[in-house]
From Swiss-Prot:
This is Tol-Pal system protein TolB. Part of the Tol-Pal system, which plays a role in outer membrane invagination during cell division and is important for maintaining outer membrane integrity. TolB occupies a key intermediary position in the Tol-Pal system because it communicates directly with both membrane-embedded components, Pal in the outer membrane and TolA in the inner membrane. Belongs to the TolB family. Keywords: Cell cycle, Cell division, Periplasm, Signal. Its main location: periplasm. One of its GO terms (biological process) is cell division. It is found in: Periplasm. It comes from Dickeya dadantii (strain 3937) (Erwinia chrysanthemi (strain 3937)). NCBIfam families: propeller_TolB. The Tol-Pal system is composed of five core proteins: the inner membrane proteins TolA, TolQ and TolR, the periplasmic protein TolB and the outer membrane protein Pal. They form a network linking the inner and outer membranes and the peptidoglycan layer.
Amino acid sequence: MKQALKIALSFLMLWTAVLHAEVRIEITQGVDSARPIGVVPFKSTGGAVPEEIGSIVAADLRNSGKFNPIDPSRMPQQPGSAAEVTPAAWTALGIDAVIVGQVQPTADGYMVSYQLVDTSGSAGSVLAQNQFKVTKQWLRYAAHTASDEVFEKLTGIKGAFRTRIAYVVQTNGGQYPYELRVADYDGYNQFVVHRSPEPLMSPSWSADGSKLAYVTFESGRSALVVQTLANGDIKQVASFPRHNGAPAFSPDGSKLAFALSKSGSLNLYVMNLGSGQISQVTDGRSNNTEPTWFPDSQTLAYTSDQAGRPQIYKIGINGGAPQRLTWEGSQNQDSEISSDGKFLVMVSSNSGAQHIAKQDLVTGGVQVLTDTFLDETPSIAPNGTMVIYSSKQGLGSVLQLVSTDGRFKARLPATDGQVRFPAWSPYM
């Protein structure tokens, strides 16, 4: 948690002005079938608190698609500690777990504490508990930390509520209509990383969450840059003739893959970030682009038109023949591999429709996850439970969320421009 606090604090030091036109999660499908849970409003033991911690925890669990927190007006009681919970009152509503908590002012901030209480199996027992001493600006972070711990205790899956998303917003006019922004996963605490008069594309997070690689056209042609979030430093890593695009950091943090067309067709290259040495991975007259890494940091999945239409292939970065991965649909592109390497998500086109699909890399089974319009650029949460992507809505582009089982759906509408190229951060 200390490393995460250090990274997040560096963001706050550099970008203290939070934008007003933030994206916010609006759930559109799936929460009604999720597991009911009680998240009692946290008790304040010393005056008003600037953030309602219980509401943030409830929103996190609801946004996961796996829980459906009941409305406080339906709660049989509103206890502040495990000792005050009456298990039978909750199980009568079909609720087998309740979260209670307190927020106590301190000399320089707040003490936030929570308890997760079992109301059925071992009625009244505390399944998880913790407390966090934070300043005012870290109250939301404390709430997300509690959510992560509760989520993992109840599901066995690591929570991802302290992660961030990066995305590009094209605003209407102005000197710098293109902005690369970063926000908490739920759209709060949004800030601008970089403004540009020319298009920005394809942000990619470094393995430790401290840097973003992206494509810029500020020099008059495409270039790949890496920006350090703590100090804003920008380093150009590729600006070859013709196309430079699709950057992707390796999971071990040592390499950056990207696509170049300096020799004619698009091909994949990998840069060793320690030495700066660039090696070519694919070669030929077909177009090979949109690399994404397998967990071993030695293998890439990518889009290629070597069979005529775009499909997903994989290849080792040290040589070998490519292997085709996708066979369903007229074309498949823009894939991302899950952090455990068990599945990929991609943009799949069939019969004129363009949706986000998931392919099991063991069985080969494919599931279409979305029903939105002209879906693009999917990015998977680090725990593999959710996908963020952009789609067309009306005349603009918005961000959408879908669970990797396809049951839960939500959108993150923005009010000040078109939003594209979402990228979900690693754990922070």
